[in-house]
Amino acid sequence: MTVELPRPWRWFRHPPGPEYRSILVVDIAGFGRWSNPHQIVARDVLTTAVRDGFRAAGVRQADLGRQDRGDGMAVLIPAHVSKVDILDPVIPELISRLRRHNATAVPRIRIRLSLHAGEVHRDAHGWVGSDLNTACRLVDAEPVRAGLLGDAVLVVSDVLYRSVVRHGYRRVDPAAFSRVEVAEKEVREPAWVAQVS
């Protein structure tokens, strides 16, 4: 006997194909210890800094997918945007905007960023996929938390380090990255961490 599933359930068994995206996850350190008003300001500052970073690379906001994470966000970047552009100028411009805020603000906003790429799905609720999960695990990994010494720390996946970072495009300095082992939930893999200046 064959049971025919209702139409919505058939979709879940065979979802539409994934999209390849670069994935930038930004997380505000210590966010949960702040008052609600401080959290609201920090989220606004971060949103503006991310917008300005992508604007510096000529990326239209309408092309970006965003997923709110409460204390940060995941930005899903279309494949036509070079990973080199994300590493320079997007991330340096984002950090520059953050530092301008921090020059006069208390508490300072300190962030962890992860950069990965892979296949993701978009549904009625946002974005989903194991590569997005990996980017989120990287930003939360203990070596990345411990590596946040200044305003920002960046972790890139091993595949992104090997395919882009190690070649030293533009102002990207491969020597600034240290290899770490990430063991966060289902993710067990090497990654590369650098202080962002």
Annotated model-derived regions:
Residues 56-58, 95-105, 141-146:
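Short catalytic/binding micro-motifs of nucleotide second-messenger systems
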Residues 59-83, 102-130:
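Catalytic core of nucleotidyl cyclases, primarily class III adenylyl/guanylyl cyclases
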Residues 87-94:
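Short amphipathic alpha-helices in soluble, non-transmembrane regions
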Residues 134-158:
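Catalytic/regulatory signature loops of cyclic-dinucleotide turnover enzymes
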Residues 2-85:
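Catalytic NTP-binding/metal-coordinating core of nucleotidyl cyclase/transferase enzymes
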Residues 126-135, 169-171:
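Short, surface-exposed, charged loop/turn segments at secondary-structure junctions
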